[in-house]
């Protein structure tokens, strides 16, 4: 059946219109919609961008069409990340068909598919993880991001290794820590190995702070450190200080691994990961992802509340030395115009496998969420979206 695309109808003509920058959706499911033209979009071109996205839903293994459901992550994730120590240890589930939402000036101008479906966000989870670090920074629980992690917490014996002792919060947040050790049965060298599974093990530990490596093991080490810092489950921290203040639903949930339980100050705490590489991570709807995108668009502010400080957002958007396309996790930057050549250099994306995309265009006051688009097509979607804006 052809997917129905909803290009929204105008709000009531007699409604008093607030200044665009002043509108934010209230808590719950109510979210004001506007016709694309009213918010500066060419409706036909916007529909073309959406049609493109729908036509390019990801299929990780086309050869398996007709054999397995390509949306069943219980099958595709173990195949995608097959390698040493790659068995899933957290929940996986089938995901909804491709869906998305486009926001301008805070209003929904387009929405398609099931944007209320609660699905895995994969590495977009890292954006929520770094937000819990941001709240800790803003509350002076982390005095300086260039302080050593060990100056605050001692999460495991691996953190005490001589190689790991100099590692700072900033390096962990930028994925330049070079942390070595094992997290929940997954050794550092086995995550996204090179041509040979043993390449990184043979090469030895990378220098701290000098190399950028996308590593869920190291991300999970940060999650453990932050759990020790907060002395409570990170989903509770996120809910109290971020998700509830921005009016998110109660449908999202952040899942840990089967074996990621610790006892801290007499409490039994489930430590959550920063992605879905081995299952688990954030399960969330496109609508709630859009709220997080709006928080990013507004530089950490939601109405009269500064949820994440200007200083934290500035750090999040500061390019990382070894990889200028990356800030704090998981702020992918367009500094070199490689991520999205058609967008401005100051635009950003929160990205997760699948692909799960939260695109933020600061100049045009736009947030777009697209879930389950082919990784190689996200830049073209952004080009079509930008082309739909009236000049």
Ranges and model annotations:
Residues 19-114, 139-142, 232, 388-391:
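N-terminal leader/targeting segments and the immediately adjacent pre-domain N-terminus
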Residues 32, 54, 58-91, 121, ...:
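Active-site-proximal loop and beta-strand segments within enzyme catalytic domains
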Residues 108-117, 179-259, 280:
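Catalytic-site signature segments of enzymes, centered on catalytic residues
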């Amino acid at each position: 059946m052809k997917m129905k695309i909803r290009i929204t109808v105008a709000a009531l003509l007699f409604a008093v219109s607030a200044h665009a920058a002043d509108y934010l959706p209230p808590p719950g499911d109510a979210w004001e919609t506007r016709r694309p033209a009213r918010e500066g979009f060419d409706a036909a071109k916007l529909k073309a961008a959406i049609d493109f996205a729908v036509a390019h839903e990801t299929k990780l293994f086309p050869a398996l069409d007709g054999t397995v459901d390509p949306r069943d992550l219980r099958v595709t994730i173990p195949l995608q990340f097959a390698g040493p120590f790659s068995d899933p240890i957290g929940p996986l589930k089938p995901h909804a068909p491709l869906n998305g939402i486009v926001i301008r000036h805070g209003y929904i101008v387009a929405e398609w598919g099931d944007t209320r479906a609660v699905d895995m966000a994969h590495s977009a989870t890292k954006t929520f993880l770094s937000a819990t670090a941001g709240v800790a920074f803003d509350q002076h629980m982390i005095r300086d991001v260039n302080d050593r992690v060990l100056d605050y917490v001692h999460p495991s014996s691996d953190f005490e290794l001589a190689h790991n002792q100099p590692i700072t919060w900033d390096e962990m947040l930028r994925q330049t820590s070079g942390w070595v050790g094992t997290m929940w049965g997954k050794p550092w060298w086995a995550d996204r190995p090179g041509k040979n599974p043993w390449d990184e093990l043979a090469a030895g530990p990378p220098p701290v702070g000098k190399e950028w490596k996308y590593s869920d093991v190291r991300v999970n080490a940060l999650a453990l450190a932050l759990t020790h810092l907060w002395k409570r489950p990170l989903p509770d921290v996120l809910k109290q200080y971020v998700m509830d203040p921005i009016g998110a639903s109660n449908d999202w949930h952040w899942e840990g691994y089967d074996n990621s339980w610790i006892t801290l100050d007499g409490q039994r705490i489930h430590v959550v990961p920063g992605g879905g590489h081995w299952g688990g991570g954030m399960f969330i709807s496109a609508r709630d992802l859009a709220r997080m995108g709006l928080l990013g668009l507004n530089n950490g502010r939601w109405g009269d509340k500064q949820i994440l400080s200007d200083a934290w957002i500035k750090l999040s958007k500061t390019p990382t030395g070894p990889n200028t396309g990356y800030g704090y996790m998981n702020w992918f930057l367009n500094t070199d115009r490689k991520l999205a050549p058609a967008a401005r250099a100051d635009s950003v994306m929160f990205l997760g496998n699948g692909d799960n995309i939260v695109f933020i265009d600061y100049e045009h006051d736009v947030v777009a969420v697209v879930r389950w688009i082919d990784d190689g097509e996200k830049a073209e979607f952004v080009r079509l979206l930008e082309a739909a804006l009236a000049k």
